[in-house]
UniProtKB/Swiss-Prot annotation:
Chain's role: May affect the post-translational activation and/or assembly of the oligomeric structure of RuBisCO.
Top-level taxon of origin: Bacteria
Binding site for ATP: 41-48
Name of this chain's protein: Protein CbbQ
Keyword set, alphabetical order: ATP-binding, Nucleotide-binding
Family per similarity comment: Belongs to the CbbQ/NirQ/NorQ/GpvN family.
InterPro entries tied to this protein: ATPase_dyneun-rel_AAA (IPR011704), P-loop_NTPase (IPR027417)
Gene Ontology terms for molecular function: ATP binding; ATP hydrolysis activity
Database matches in Pfam families: AAA_5
């Protein structure tokens, strides 16, 4: 991904996120160890907001894809 493409997916302001437990430290440890992370939970529980916050905090681009039970493989 070129810098021009990358920059359009950077989060330019700090998203509001209030940690509930130690999820930020756990994510940072997984990121440092290059371990994949899977977030699972019901609609509206904060998964997207959390990854937006972590992308901003780590200075990484973020591309989101909405997936649900109506989505097909084609």
């Amino acid at each position: 991904m070129s810098d021009i493409d990358r920059n359009q997916f950077l989060i330019d302001h700090e998203p509001y996120y209030r940690p509930v437990s130690n999820e930020v430290a756990l994510y940072e440890a997984a990121y440092a160890a290059r371990m994949p992370v899977m977030l699972k939970g019901p609609t509206g529980c904060g998964k997207t907001r959390f990854v937006e916050y972590m992308a901003w905090k780590l200075g990484k681009p973020l591309i989101t894809v909405a997936c649900n039970e109506d989505m097909t493989a084609s």
